[in-house]
Curated annotation (Swiss-Prot):
EC number: 7.1.2.1
Region (Disordered): 1-123
Species: Dictyostelium discoideum (Social amoeba)
Catalytic residues (positions): D480 (4-aspartylphosphate intermediate)
Main location: membrane
GO biological process, one term: proton export across plasma membrane
CDD domains in the cross-refs: P-type_ATPase_H
Name under which the protein is recorded: Probable plasma membrane ATPase
Length: 1058
């Protein structure tokens, strides 16, 4: 085809030459600058003429075609196609108008007849870059030239409009940035980095003092602060100082531990900072996104998060997801000269861009500066609030009871009341200080922060702390097949040619459609390695890859434009069904090829279709050459890991875009079951059950698109499941964000990682299972501590309330402060306790927590009240074992010791799932318990003196300021220890009984549980559980029923056909 019909100096001519000679259309600042100024005056005049022109009849709207000329000031044929109106100047003749309108004049008919041969010769070429609807423009050079001028005027008008909006033309931007398509030098980039700073949004300025005080700003701390004010009112300065010390101690420990753990996790997050391909000194290098500066030239490909505001200087089928910035639900097509914004995601194609703004100067950065981002209350905060309200309400009830008793003067029960000594306030102070679990927020936040650090050691980096709770509660994991269940190391098997096509041609043409360098994916690497290893003597030098078309999820293929000794051809590789159906030999070989694809799938192979087109220049005719079998072997540990997940109550569902047959074969090899479906089948199934039920019982899904993954997650959530979703690509982002736990696998794109709750740094399903186990242990630590703390509130308030009301026994406030300090110091070690993860998903059940805590608390109240009553009202211990009779002041020391021992020992019961004797605590917990009880024993034996002049008197009318009490001696201390141990033994049976009532079952005692006894002697606890949970067994039964129903349905259909 010659180009004589097109003027040599026209934009069409330059566009054709550009398309034929270069792999990608480059736009430099020199070309744009020259075109812009050269035609400026001419276009301004044309604008004036255009306003006087009359509009003529229109043609129907045609579909847009692909842009050929990327010059912003040239003719853009895709914009012509998108216009619904074709306006022809009034000076064009009537014959021209009739030709365009579809009514050719006789003169034009004759001319067309004389030149029909040439028209047919030129048709194919024009149809590759001009909308078919507008081909008649070429019949009339006058109309075409007018259209060119009109389009250039339209382009200039749009340029002026962009300037008015503050959007400068690309050539102006490059000129202002002092940049070009070759990027910056390293020296210039370093200079600009020092001037503008790193490409990052500055962290919110931290105020350590405010962060420290935040640990004292919660309802529980407020209650303790009220207690401090009450102690001031009582002029009880020792209590005031100790209460303040307790508040400061909790805040200090929480601040230090949380910052230490947070800094460790933040360092790991920083190691995941995205790397951007940037041109420096004329060479492509990988740079961290914070090192980018205005003027840098970067290459963005599918899946990347755009690191800064940029302008496109080269584009290849680019679509950008701007929903996080603009709220647009659909991806936006970007062309040369368009702006792309920081924080957007590349959904399709690749683009070469110049950075125009970084950091706070970006569109996203300016918004971040203007809007104060607020976080909603996390689930843990809601749980803490509810627990705090329960404890405060319980304390308030007993305070009211004591106040009523004291002020109403029930002398029949209380002696010496109404002495005018502020005794009601003193009694209330005891309940406030002893009952408030002041360390709870600190312990739980520290447990979460340290847990995040522990998860990072398991190759799972947590980006949202609340996801630890959700991971522990997860009962369904939708796992990507490639790279997670399999090795993602594809191996090429023997090619299968069609007809007499040589095998080396299939592999060679597939190789020419592969990307090169760091952009290669697993398929490209497998083909490239096979081609070089199998055919090392083949000379590739005569074939130049002019242009590579990357894999597009929409049409599921990749292509290469090749120049072979002056002749051009295209090769394509991709999904075999799509490649096959586009081929000219589909009717001849289609049935046989599709059968072979099924045979390969049955054997666990993935087929890659290969075709070639020599139909230059439009390449519409393709010839299918054959199949390349690919095999991605399962990981060696995947089958065992899936069984392990089932034993833990987590159902693993395969999610893959591969064909159904391949997915079924992979599932069979992994022992996952055979209930795999495609979404179209689910929507139109004949099984007689709803789509949601089938999704719930299915073992996996094949041929999945992004919207299908989202739908699966949504249906499972509607059925009250906690769903985890793995993914790695930009198309997985919606489903990752929808799931309660979005998990970005190793090597995931920036887009996937940005919306994920957990980012894996190692491949394989076992990493996820290890993370689940760790999260359940973290949850168990938090749950155990909450049960202990609520039980302590119930125990202390009820015990001292009854002692005051029934015996007028005033307990010293200082004793409760000491108990709180020792207990809280011990409980801070719970974050590193050695616990056993449950075999079922774990989540907060406050009814169960409060029920267990009330049972423990009232049981321990009984142990203290019975112990007190025997000593206070009788002489059994004196008569039986010859212990001396205690005064009331010495009895206070004994009761202090008994309450301290029995209360802290509760943690051993609450931290275990079965018998506490079989589950050894962590060494740090044991050490803290022993040290705290040594201190408590010495205080109980020798007493405590606050004010030297203040001492308790046996006179019931003597004011009790609560600063002193006498010791009980070693004999009574040993008695208290024995008493506590005897009452401790039945607590495990109480726990198991309550658990059975609430759950309908208890943790089974099996060989593994018994072997845990040896954990006391340092032997390793078996990691894998052996008990399959009731829930998983039920799910497996449902899956079996579904499989049987599907098999029966198929047999009925077969019988009907027969």
């Amino acid at each position: 085809m010659d180009n004589n019909q097109i003027p040599k100096n026209s934009p069409e001519s330059s566009a054709i030459n550009s398309a034929e000679s270069s792999p990608k259309s480059n736009v430099s600042s020199d070309v744009l600058h020259e075109n812009h100024h050269k035609e400026q005056q001419q276009l301004q005049q044309q604008l004036q003429q255009e306003q006087q022109q009359q509009q003529l009849p229109t043609t129907p709207q045609s579909e847009p075609t692909q842009r050929v000329n990327n010059n912003e000031e040239g003719i853009e044929m895709d914009r012509i196609a998108e216009n619904s109106n074709i306006n022809v100047p009034s000076d064009v003749g009537e014959s021209s108008l009739k030709t365009i309108s579809g009514y050719p004049s006789s003169k034009n008919t004759e001319a067309g007849s004389s030149s029909s041969g040439k028209k047919e010769e030129d048709y194919n070429y024009r149809s590759t870059w001009v909308p078919k609807l507008h081909q008649e423009l070429f019949e009339n050079p006058e109309v075409l030239e007018s259209r060119r001028t009109k389009q250039r005027a339209s382009n200039y008008r749009k340029t002026l409009e962009r300037e008015k909006e503050g959007i400068k033309p690309l050539d102006n931007i490059l000129e202002e940035l002092k940049a070009n398509a070759n990027g910056l030098t390293k020296a210039e980039a370093q200079k600009r980095l020092e001037e503008v700073g790193p490409n990052a949004i500055p962290d919110v300025k931290r105020y350590p003092i405010l962060e420290f005080l935040y640990f004292m700003w919660n309802p529980l701390s407020w209650t303790m602060e009220v207690a401090a004010i009450v102690s001031i009112a009582l002029l009880d300065w020792v209590d005031f100082i100790l209460i303040c010390a307790l508040l400061l101690l909790n805040a200090t420990i929480g601040f230090i531990e949380e910052n230490t753990a947070g800094n460790a996790v933040e360092a790991l997050k920083n190691s995941l900072v995205s790397q951007i391909r940037c041109m420096r000194d004329g060479e492509w290098v990988m740079l961290p996104s914070p090192d980018l500066v205005p003027g840098d030239v970067v290459m963005l490909k599918i899946g990347a998060i755009i690191p800064a505001d940029c302008r496109v200087i080269e584009a290849e089928q680019v679509k950008i997801d701007q929903s996080s910035l603009t709220g647009e639900s659909l991806p936006v097509t970007k062309k040369i000269g368009d702006e792309v914004y920081s924080g957007s995601a590349m959904k399709q194609g690749e683009a070469k861009c110049v950075v125009t703004a970084t950091g706070v100067n970006t569109f996203f950065g300016r918004a971040a500066n203007l809007v104060q981002e607020t976080e909603g209350h996390g689930h843990l905060q809601v749980i803490l609030r509810n627990i705090g309200l329960f404890c405060i309400s319980f304390i308030a009830i007993w305070v009211l009871v004591e106040l009523l008793v004291d002020f109403l003067g029930y002398d029949g029960y209380c002696h010496g009341v109404g002495g005018g000594r502020c005794l009601p306030l003193n009694n209330a102070l005891v309940l406030l200080v002893g009952g408030i679990p002041i360390a709870m927020p600190t312990v739980l936040s520290v447990t979460m922060a340290i847990g995040a650090t522990q998860l990072s050691k398991k190759k799972a980096i947590v980006s949202r702390l609340a996801s630890i709770e959700e991971l522990a509660a997860m009962d369904i994991l939708c796992s990507d097949k490639t790279g997670t269940l399999t090795l993602n190391i594809l191996t090429v098997d023997e090619p299968l040619p069609v007809g007499d096509t040589p095998k080396e041609d299939i592999v060679f043409h597939a190789f020419l459609a592969c990307s090169e360098g760091e952009d290669q994916d697993a398929i490209d690497k497998a083909i490239s390695n096979y081609c070089r290893d199998t055919y090392p003597n083949v000379d590739y030098s005569g074939n130049e890859i002019v242009k590579h078309y990357p894999f597009n999820p929409e049409d599921k293929k990749a292509m290469g434009l090749v120049n072979a000794n002056g002749k051009q051809f295209k090769t394509a590789k991709g999904a075999p069904q799509i490649i096959l159906r586009e081929a000219d030999n589909y009717k001849q070989v289609g049935e046989a090829v599709e059968k072979e694809i099924e045979n390969l799938a049955d054997r666990g192979y993935r087929a890659l279709g290969v075709s070639v087109s020599y139909d230059a220049p439009d390449f519409k005719v393709w010839h299918f050459e054959g199949l390349i079998p690919l095999f991605d072997p399962p990981r060696h540990d995947t089958e065992d890991t899936i069984k392990r997940a089932l034993e833990m109550g987590v159902s693993v569902k395969m999610i893959t875009g591969d064909q159904l047959a391949i997915a079924k074969e992979t599932a069979r090899r992994l022992g996952m079951g055979g209930n795999l479906f495609t979404i179209p089948y689910l929507e139109n199934n004949d099984l007689g059950i709803s789509e949601g039920e089938v999704i719930e019982m299915a073992d996996g899904f094949a041929e999945m698109w992004p919207e299908h993954k989202y739908k699966v997650v949504d249906q499972l959530q509607k059925r009250k499941h906690v769903v985890g979703m793995t993914g790695d690509g930009v198309n997985d982002a919606p489903a990752l964000k929808k799931a309660q736990i979005g998990i970005a696998v190793a090597g995931a794109t920036d887009a996937a990682r940005s919306v994920s709750d957990i980012v894996l740094t190692s491949s394989g399903l076992s990493v996820i299972i290890d993370a689940i186990i760790s999260s359940r242990k973290i949850f168990q630590r938090m749950r155990n501590y909450v049960i202990y703390s609520v039980a302590a509130t119930v125990r202390i308030c009820t015990t001292f309330g009854i002692l005051t009301v029934a015996w007028n026994f005033k307990f010293p406030t200082i004793a409760t402060v000491i108990i709180a300090i020792l207990n809280d110091g011990t409980m801070l070690t719970i974050s590193k306790d050695r616990v056993r993860a449950r075999n079922e998903p774990d989540q907060w059940n406050l009814f169960e927590v409060f029920t267990m805590a009330l049972c423990y608390g009232f049981y321990l109240v009984g142990s203290t009240i019975v112990f007190f009553a025997i000593i206070h009202d009788g002489t059994w211990f004196h008569d039986a074992i010859n212990l001396r009779i205690l005064t009331d002041n010495e009895l206070r020391g004994l009761i202090y010791l008994q309450v301290s021992i029995s209360g802290l020992a509760t943690i051993f019961v609450s931290r275990s799932q079965g018998f506490s004797y079989f589950e050894r605590p962590g060494n740090l917990v044991i050490f803290a318990f022993v040290m705290s009880q040594i201190v408590a024993t010495f205080i109980g034996v020798y007493g405590f003196r606050g004010y030297p002049h203040d001492s308790f008197s046996d006179n019931p009318d003597y004011p009790v300021h609560g600063t002193n009490f006498q010791g009980c001696g070693w004999g009574w201390a040993v008695c208290a220890w024995i008493w506590c141990f005897l009452w401790y033994i039945p607590m495990d049976f109480i726990k198991l009984g309550v658990t059975y009532i609430l759950r309908g079952k208890i943790e089974p005692i099996n060989k593994d549980a018994l072997r845990k006894i040896y954990g006391w002697f340092g032997k390793e606890i078996p990691k894998e559980a052996t008990q399959v949970s009731h829930k998983v067994a039920e799910q497996q039964a449902k899956r079996d029923a579904l499989h049987a129903q599907e098999t029966h349905h198929k047999s009925v259909v077969t019988d009907n056909k027969v």
